[in-house]
Amino acid sequence: MTKAIVLGGSRGVGKSISNALKTIEIDVFAASKNEIDTSDLNSVKKFLEKNTQTDILVLNTGGPEPKPFLTITEEDWKFYHNQLFLGFVTILQNIKINNGGYIFLISSSVIKEPNAKLIISSAYRAAFAEVFKVLSKEYAEKNISCV
């Protein structure tokens, strides 16, 4: 049976994706923030100890609340750097996607049209989207599709 891991799979868009995959008889692990918190790299590493491979990986996470640039703290930048960028990088460096598999990146329109009130989300989601584009060429050589 095909296996899928859906980050943020317990509510919102992630839950809808999880439910849709289940209707086509895919074994879905709908990971909540309790199972993996991408803002906490120790949580990511612990998750990866138990989840070493999959056929389908859905990279999905919430984002920061709208905030004017001058009110964003250093802690905000660090927290969302991990949640929206480094957590996903760590996952891709350490999980095996099976041959013929898929990786889906659920992101935001801010990667194409930055939003001044969502500057953290705009910056980190766009940065990871670029990494994802570069990696898609490497994954394609292994018959893994990046969407």
Stretch-by-stretch model annotation:
Residues 58, 87-95, 131-132:
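Hydrophobic positions on the long internal alpha-helix
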Residues 11, 62-65, 109:
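Flexible cofactor-recognition loop at the NAD(P)H-binding site
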Residues 63, 70-89, 104, 121, ...:
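Catalytic Tyr-X3-Lys loop
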Residues 31-42:
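Rossmann-fold cofactor-recognition segment
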Residues 7, 54-62, 84, 105, ...:
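Rossmann-fold scaffold of SDR-type NAD(P)-dependent oxidoreductases
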Residues 10, 14, 18:
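N-terminal Rossmann NAD(P)H-binding glycine-rich loop of SDR-like oxidoreductase domains
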Residues 64-68, 100, 112-115:
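Helix N-cap/beta-alpha junction loops of NAD(P)-dependent oxidoreductase domains
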Residues 104-128, 132-141:
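Catalytic loop of short-chain dehydrogenase/reductase
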